Amino acid sequence: MANLKLLLVGIGNPGQKYVHNRHNIGFVILDSLLDSSSVSYQTNSKYSLARTDEDGVTIFYLKPLEFMNLSGKSVAEIAKKNGISPENILIIHDEIDFEFGKLKLKGGGGHAGHNGLRNIVEKLGTNTFFRLRFGVGKPSITSEVPDYVLSNFLPNEKEKIPELVKVSLQKISDWIRERKNGFQKLSDNQ
C-alpha cells in the first residue's frame, strides 16, 4: 500500500524580534505540534523541516525561514520534492478577518490579501490546499494592518494562547485523521 504524505506548514517571519508577533502564530502552533514528539527540525538557510512516519502516514512539518511574503518558495519545493499534492497541504496562519481566538479550518479559497498565502498560491499554482486560520483581530484603520500583524499579542490575549493552541492542535489532528481515512478508502477501492 502506498504511503500518505502530508505537509503541515506554519508561516511567520524569521528572527528573534518577530517571535511573539501576531503574524507568527503559525510558527507557534507548528512548534507545539512537535513539542510532544522526539522529532526535531533540520534547518538550512531557507527553512526548518521535520518529518514523522507513523501508521502509513508521513508528515512533513515546515517553517519557511524567508519572510512570510516569500513562504511559497519553500512550500512548493518540499511539496514537489516529496510528491505531496496541494490537497494534502495544511497552511497554519494568522487571520485578521477573524476576531482574536476564532479558529477555522478551510479548504481552498482566496488569499484575502494575506501576502504569505498569496505567494503560496502563486508558487503552487493552485489554491486547493487547506488552511487553519487563527483569528488575531484587526485594527480599525486598514492602513495600520502591517504594523498590527507585526505587533505582539496583548497580555490578556497572550494568556489565552496556550488554550487556543490546544484547540488548534485538535483541529489539525482531526484534519490528519480525515486525510488518512479518505486515503485509505481510496486505496481500498483500487
Swiss-Prot record:
<comment type="subunit">
    <text>Monomer.</text>
</comment>
<comment type="function">
    <text>Hydrolyzes ribosome-free peptidyl-tRNAs (with 1 or more amino acids incorporated), which drop off the ribosome during protein synthesis, or as a result of ribosome stalling.</text>
</comment>
<dbReference type="InterPro" id="IPR001328">
    <property type="entry name" value="Pept_tRNA_hydro"/>
</dbReference>
<dbReference type="GO" id="GO:0000049">
    <property type="term" value="F:tRNA binding"/>
</dbReference>
<feature type="binding site">
    <location>
        <position position="115"/>
    </location>
    <ligand>
        <name>tRNA</name>
    </ligand>
</feature>
<comment type="similarity">
    <text>Belongs to the PTH family.</text>
</comment>
<feature type="site" description="Stabilizes the basic form of H active site to accept a proton">
    <location>
        <position position="94"/>
    </location>
</feature>
<dbReference type="GO" id="GO:0004045">
    <property type="term" value="F:peptidyl-tRNA hydrolase activity"/>
</dbReference>
<comment type="function">
    <text>Catalyzes the release of premature peptidyl moieties from peptidyl-tRNA molecules trapped in stalled 50S ribosomal subunits, and thus maintains levels of free tRNAs and 50S ribosomes.</text>
</comment>
<dbReference type="InterPro" id="IPR018171">
    <property type="entry name" value="Pept_tRNA_hydro_CS"/>
</dbReference>
<dbReference type="InterPro" id="IPR036416">
    <property type="entry name" value="Pept_tRNA_hydro_sf"/>
</dbReference>
<dbReference type="GO" id="GO:0006515">
    <property type="term" value="P:protein quality control for misfolded or incompletely synthesized proteins"/>
</dbReference>
<feature type="binding site">
    <location>
        <position position="69"/>
    </location>
    <ligand>
        <name>tRNA</name>
    </ligand>
</feature>
<feature type="active site" description="Proton acceptor">
    <location>
        <position position="23"/>
    </location>
</feature>
<keyword id="KW-0694">RNA-binding</keyword>
<feature type="binding site">
    <location>
        <position position="18"/>
    </location>
    <ligand>
        <name>tRNA</name>
    </ligand>
</feature>
<dbReference type="Pfam" id="PF01195">
    <property type="entry name" value="Pept_tRNA_hydro"/>
</dbReference>
<keyword id="KW-0378">Hydrolase</keyword>
<keyword id="KW-0963">Cytoplasm</keyword>
<dbReference type="GO" id="GO:0005737">
    <property type="term" value="C:cytoplasm"/>
</dbReference>
<feature type="binding site">
    <location>
        <position position="67"/>
    </location>
    <ligand>
        <name>tRNA</name>
    </ligand>
</feature>
<feature type="site" description="Discriminates between blocked and unblocked aminoacyl-tRNA">
    <location>
        <position position="13"/>
    </location>
</feature>
<keyword id="KW-0820">tRNA-binding</keyword>
<protein>
    <recommendedName>
        <fullName>Peptidyl-tRNA hydrolase</fullName>
        <ecNumber>3.1.1.29</ecNumber>
    </recommendedName>
</protein>
<dbReference type="GO" id="GO:0072344">
    <property type="term" value="P:rescue of stalled ribosome"/>
</dbReference>
